């Protein structure tokens, strides 16, 4: 589900209209705020639903291949009961800790991804300005220390100016908003994350709103 509001609306309707069994397991894969986790914990306590927060990473490709990584927060017993279901579409399922820790792990993931994508965008801008052969740059760097999943899978599509796929900048903007909200409570100044967040925010008024997060490069070169 898209954001806190969508998640909240869905589960309020679910509780009112669904004939669920007592102790039904709720596996929530959306990336949501910690405030929303608190609201869901209260919402599920009355009907005695078992709840784990289990955001994912791996993108469209991972979902299709069944190779998503899942970060789980919640009771260990609930995690163990849910793991068999999660293993159908995931090849890496990790219990992080108490409820909400799944979201914190996903926030950490998004901080890393936005920083890597910003570096890739600057590297592309630099190599292009120097009129380097982009295919040769990719082949030279893909197996070196500068490589990553994002570089291997997104640099070639950036070179081709192809962005109409993948995890949208709209969703990344939402995720980074939640990251920065929580960081503020901890008195953390995430300078690079905030800078990238502002660039993604500007893309929301463009066609790139629904395009892959790698279209961040457009905020540097267009």
Kindly label every feature range from the protein language model.
Residues 3-51:
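Rossmann-fold NAD(P) dinucleotide-binding segment
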Residues 25, 50, 69, 189-191:
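Proline-centered loop/turn at the N-terminus of a beta-strand
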Residues 31-114:
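Rossmann-fold dinucleotide-binding core
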Residues 7, 93-96, 151, 158:
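Short clusters of hydrophobic/aromatic residues that line enzyme substrate/ligand-binding pockets
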Residues 24, 65-69, 155:
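Short, solvent-exposed beta-strand edge segments and adjacent coil->beta transition regions
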Residues 101-220:
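Helical "substrate-binding/catalytic lid" subdomain
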Residues 3-4, 57-58, 143-147:
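Short glycine-enriched loops at secondary-structure junctions
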